[in-house]
Amino acid sequence: MEDKQAKPLRILLSNDDGVFAEGIRTLASELRTLAEVIIVAPDRNRSGASNSLTLEQPLRVTCVEENVYSVQGTPTDCVHFALNELLKNDLPDLVLSGINHGANLGDDVLYSGTVAAAMEGHFLGVQSIAFSLVGKTHFKTAATIAKRIVEQHLAKPIPTNRLLNINIPDLPLEQLEEIRVTRLGARHHAENMIKQLDPRGHEIYWLGPPGKEQDAGEGTDFHAIEQGYVSITPLQVDLTAHESLRAMDTWLKEK
């Protein structure tokens, strides 16, 4: 009797920059030497969509080429559709999101569609990783790092039931330092709104730029990137402030 061949690795890719973005296409090209790659991504840029789901209209899905699907929806919609419908009978081994065109550091992760896509994969039981390039030039560098992470996971699975947020400096590969495990830093709140007039004279507003780093000390993702290191931050989705449970219980019982 012949031995059964090992099942080939299967990877789902998504993002928030859109199905035709350079980051996701570069990542897919790099990973196709390792695995079957299926792209399910938004039909346009959905940066900042966070974990939003489309509930008031249908999701329109178009197969734009073999194993590449465009979805009129958010990054979370894309992964939800892929795992609960498109690939439900043969789930992927990994969900990867990115490569994002820009950083997802500190509390950026609360707004990030890139991180949200990975979070949805995590919710649905698949090991998930978000990749972001801190810039818009060296996507090949970021894709090479992503491939190394996947290869290491294949050799020895990631030892934690957490989704990973990985940021890569926008540098040539040979200029990168090592990889550091970090915690999330924090930014000052963005307070500036940009007020303009549209062609009809109506007031319109744009959100201002992100605030500057507030907590960027040693051990944070901000600090690692500034020093030229790749940053890996394990994330959890339980938002419970466990250290506050007893204090809240005491407060409620006080007369």
From Swiss-Prot:
The keyword Transcription regulation does not apply. Its main location: cytoplasm. GO terms for molecular function: 3'-nucleotidase activity; 5'-nucleotidase activity; exopolyphosphatase activity; metal ion binding; nucleotide binding. A divalent metal cation binds at D16, D17, S47, N100. Pfam families: SurE. InterPro entries: SurE (IPR030048), SurE-like_Pase/nucleotidase (IPR002828), SurE-like_sf (IPR036523). Binds 1 divalent metal cation per subunit. The keyword Transferase does not apply. Nucleotidase that shows phosphatase activity on nucleoside 5'-monophosphates. HAMAP family: SurE. This is 5'-nucleotidase SurE. The gene is surE.
